[in-house]
Amino acid sequence: MEEERLLEELESKLGIEFQNINLLVTALTHSSYANENKNAEYNERLEFLGDAVLQLSISEYFFKKYPTISEGELTKKRALVVCGMSLHSIGERWQLGKYIRMSHGEELTGGRTRVSIIADCVEAVIAAIYLDKGFDTAKNFILREFEGTIQNAVENKIILDYKTRLQEILQSKGKTDIKYTLVRHEGPPHRRKFFVNLNFDNDVKSTGEGYTKKDAEQDAACKALKGLDN
């Protein structure tokens, strides 16, 4: 069966063999899929738990590894490791979009490569590992998979300001009229997602999304940068 083969393939990539494979299935299920399949569980609750497991694991690591770094600096470095863009990079390395269950409509609109969907799914997978194997296994998994990201954060090598990079490139080409416009938001107040259009050359070049307006703007800039590369 194709779904079973894909699950085994992802388990191999993660280096985790699940006792309860349904946890992984739920972690890989987007809400759009559940909307079309009413008995399917989707991954939002796992995202919530995975975020907490990730935050604690990274916090504990930084606290023990760097006893002379101030609380404020530790907070900044942790934020770099756990931000949506970093999570998306991890998910891309796993080719996570290939395994996510989503509606046909979501897939047609680019859901398999959408930053927020991939990032949320990474958190859900972490939660699935935590529930299946316990905290120590989940923590060791995080420290292994995020090793490069952690090191880059410590060495201040993570650059997340896509807006500035895009502005520099466009200004070098004589384009200065760059606008970010909030077009809508959706979801409950505690989990509100924002959508922002990026405009230049009198045209909408990309639409970004994120759980803050700033993240949505950065996502839009990141997508526009990829478009410039193509």
UniProtKB/Swiss-Prot annotation:
GO terms for molecular function: double-stranded RNA binding; metal ion binding; ribonuclease III activity; rRNA binding. PROSITE patterns: DS_RBD, RNASE_3_1, RNASE_3_2. Its cofactor is Mg(2+). Its EC number is 3.1.26.3. Mg(2+) binds at residues 47, 120, 123. It catalyses: Endonucleolytic cleavage to 5'-phosphomonoester. Homodimer. Belongs to the ribonuclease III family. This is Ribonuclease 3. The lineage of its organism: Bacteria, Bacillati, Bacillota, Clostridia, Eubacteriales.
